[in-house]
Every structure is written in structure tokens, then in C-alpha cells.
Amino acid sequence: MPASFAEEALKAQAVAARTYTLYKLISGGNHGDTADICTDSTCCQAYIAPESARANWGENAESYTEKIRTAVAATDGEAILYGGVPILAVFHASSAGLTRAARQVWQNDLPYLKPVDSPEAAESIPNYYSRVEFSPADLKQRLLAKIPGAELSGEKKNWLKNAVRDSAGSVETVEVGGVTVRGTVVRAALGLRSACFEWELQDGNFVFYVTGHGHGVGLSQYGADAMAEAGADYREILTHYYTGVAVAVYSG
């Protein structure tokens, strides 16, 4: 989350990140005996070293560092709880105006990760709408690397078809060369910013139009900032994005 965001958004992010870590510690993570959590954003949580962050912030380094310290200290010990235990507090950069349910992305249904409205100020979000173009040869190579059973020959208009979309407008499933796969598979294969995408053939190439950034589940960082700017505090933000939860000090 950008350190320039509103203080209540930063507090919400601090609690979400803390809760995610607690969840991994309690559940044992998914790295066996080697670690509880990693810094790969596609697996666990992204991390940037303080010195690198300060270099990126330039003249704002001191004020941004203090903002983050304040957000962490103000929420010290607090976590997002469902049934008294920390939740899988996933988050993403920006949604398409409605978040996604966990089952729509990972096929495991979690009661606190349901679709909710998200106030995304598209005009102020970098690359909220993105356009990516692929030649047929490039697209074929990328898709076959992830979907080796796909038959990508014949008319190009039939290479991808029959998309099924969820309530957020993201692609749940799509037929790729005769193989039905989840939209997240195509997103990963093509490096798209989200699974909320449409496509068309344009001058012989495949052009994809993408909305938002990230998996779309849980807290939207830009949505959280919009809520904070509108007057919501961090507890209101968290209980909006995570259904049926409580925000409280967790002693373990």
C-alpha cells in the first residue's frame, strides 16, 4: 500500500498484514519446515527492506516512515478475527468495483471472504485500466506453457471463447483451445493485472482490456483509501471488506 494513503487506510493495512501473518503462523504456512511465510507476493506477502523503501520515497522518506510507524503502533496487537481466531486476511491493489469471493479464485469457500462493493476511484488509480497486445505466436506460446492440452489452431477467434463471469465481472472460467480453465490461469499465463479482462482480435493480434489489479479478494487497498478519505476509520474499513469479522486485540 502506498505510504501516501490516508492514515486510516494504513491502519487497516497494518491490521490486515499482521492478521495474515498470524494466520500463517497458526496454520503452519505452506512451506513445510522451512518457513511459515515468504516474501513472494504471488504466494504470501510482498516485502521491501526499509532502506529500499526510503530510497523510493526520496524527500518524503521521513514523513512516510513516521506515518507507517504510527499506523502500526496505533493498532498494536489488533487482528481481524472470525470465531475468535485470525482470518486469512488477503488483500489486493484494486478491484473492478466489487470484490470477489474466495471460492471464485481459489475454490475454497471462506465465510468472511465474500463479494462486497468497493469504491474504486478509477481516475486516480495508476493503470486501473490496462491494455495488453499479443501476436498469435506469442499468445500461443504463453498459453500452451500453462495449458499444454489446448488445441490452438484453426480460426483465431475460437482460441479463446465461452467466458463465464462472476458478479464482479472477472472471468471465472474460459475455454482455451477446447480446454476449460479458470480465468486466473489465463491471467497468470499472460501476465495480466487481474482476471477482470475482455479481449478482441485487432489487426490480427489479440488485444486484452483489463480492469483493476490483483486477485480481487478481501481488502482493496485503493478502495480502503477511498473509504478513509470519505471518513471511515480502519475498523469500519476492515469490517466492510471482511464479512462477519471483529477487530480486536489477539493474545493467542
Feature roles, as predicted:
Residues 1-252:
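Conserved, single-site charged/polar hotspot
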